[in-house]
């Protein structure tokens, strides 16, 4: 769902 995408993006940003 949309929230899963948001969590994925947040994980990528957190990985930076």
From Swiss-Prot:
Modified residues (Leucine amide): 16
Tissue and organ expression note: Expressed by the dorsal and submental skin glands.
Coiled coil keyword on record: no
InterPro entries for this protein: Aurein_antimicrobial_peptide
Subcellular location: Secreted
One GO CC term on file: extracellular region
GO biological process: defense response to bacterium
A Pfam entry, by short name: Antimicrobial20
Keyword set, alphabetical order: Amidation, Amphibian defense peptide, Antibiotic, Antimicrobial, Secreted
Coiled-coil intervals: none
Described function: Bacteriostatic action for Gram-positive bacteria.
Protein name, UniProt field: Citropin-1.3
Source organism (scientific name): Ranoidea citropa (Australian Blue Mountains tree frog)
